Curated annotation (Swiss-Prot):
GO CC term, one of those recorded: membrane
One annotated GO biological process: lipid A biosynthetic process
Organism placement in taxonomy: Bacteria, Pseudomonadati, Pseudomonadota, Betaproteobacteria, Burkholderiales
Record-given protein name: UDP-3-O-acyl-N-acetylglucosamine deacetylase
Pfam families attached to this UniProt entry: LpxC
Signal peptide positions (record): none
Pathway: Glycolipid biosynthesis; lipid IV(A) biosynthesis; lipid IV(A) from (3R)-3-hydroxytetradecanoyl-[acyl-carrier-protein] and UDP-N-acetyl-alpha-D-glucosamine: step 2/6
Gene: lpxC
Species annotation: Burkholderia lata (strain ATCC 17760 / DSM 23089 / LMG 22485 / NCIMB 9086 / R18194 / 383)
Gene Ontology MF terms in the entry: metal ion binding; UDP-3-O-acyl-N-acetylglucosamine deacetylase activity
Length: 305
């Protein structure tokens, strides 16, 4: 059977919170089959566990924020994206603040951490959310849609109308049957505009944001000396975010995702719409790994890496 996966050993790192600017400790621990991805605020007098779930996402203005009984864990999308890309079903994530450290602004550090810990198959079938009917959410000209598809593919379009962004690809389609998440998506960094960063700092946010963890643009150009990691890094980062946002449903999706100018809020609304329509999806497993979609039937250390 196609099995669930966790990590083999405990791994730790330290990074900066993009909003608080504070040093944050992050520990990844193996978890039993059926656990899912569980975030734990270990800095509180009594640690609070918040399982990743579509219905636990609260605030989505600047990041995907998990909330439970007034306790928050913000900026979970890059780590969730790495877990999706590496096929991790079960994991404990201990964090010493209300946000996951931003690291370099991509999912690459989290991929490295998970691969350093090693990946272990577990004696339980991997469960997928198979989309059976089209589900769509619109907000003005923005939209996000899930269509039935035997595999996992995404098509994302952005429209930033900025000279530096216009020069790069604003639309990207990726099918993980024939694309490496680790090579093609994981290293794409978050991006922001210098004038917005100033506004956010005045609001007490983005105190940890810098060119060390984001692509920064002024009105005309990219300010980072080292330029871009991919020619189309902007749209690739939006896709990286979407993969993480969608993975909070708790299982990998068997679906085709299409989006135009979507963000954390629309992605979460799409998951909630799917879950509200019980005839639009089903949970499936694969007794024969070869019967699973290409990209998931892996012998290697990764899902669609």
């Amino acid at each position: 059977m196609l099995k669930q996966r966790t990590i083999k050993s405990i791994v730790k790192t330290v990074g900066i919170g993009v909003h608080s600017g504070r040093k944050i400790e992050l520990t990844l621990r193996p978890a039993a089959p059926g656990t899912g991805i569980v975030f734990s605020r270990v800095d509180l007098p009594t640690p609070v566990d918040i399982p990743a779930a579509a219905t636990s996402i609260g605030d989505t203005r600047l990041a995907s924020v998990l909330q439970k009984d007034g306790v928050r864990v913000s900026t979970v999308e890059h780590l969730m994206s790495a877990c999706a890309g590496l096929g991790i079903d079960n994991l404990y994530v201990d964090v010493t603040a209300e946000e996951i450290p931003i690291m370099d602004g991509s999912a690459a550090t989290f991929v490295f951490l998970i691969q350093s810990a090693g990946i272990e198959e577990q004696n339980a079938p991997k469960r997928f959310v198979k989309v059976k009917k089209t589900v769509e959410i619109r907000d003005g000209d923005k939209f996000a849609r899930l269509d039935p598809y035997f595999g996992f593919k995404l098509k994302f379009s952005i429209d930033f109308r900025h000279p530096a962004v216009d020069k790069t690809g604003q639309e990207l389609e990726v099918d993980f049957a024939n694309t490496s998440y680790v090579r093609e998506i994981a290293r794409a960094r978050t991006f922001g505009f210098a004038h917005e960063a100033e506004m956010l700092r005045e609001m007490g946010l983005a105190r940890g944001g810098s060119m060390e963890n984001a692509i920064v643009l002024d009105e005309y150009r990219i300010l980072n000396n080292d330029g871009l990691r991919y020619d189309d890094e902007f749209v690739k980062h939006k896709m990286l975010d979407a993969i993480g946002d969608l993975y909070v449903i708790g299982h990998p999706l068997l679906a085709s995702y299409t989006a135009y100018k979507s963000g954390h809020g629309l992605n979460n609304a799409l998951l909630r719409e799917l879950l509200a329509n019980e005839d639009a999806y089903e949970i499936v497993t694969f007794d024969d790994p070869q019967a699973a979609p290409k990209g998931f039937a892996f012998d290697m250390q990764t899902a669609f890496a």
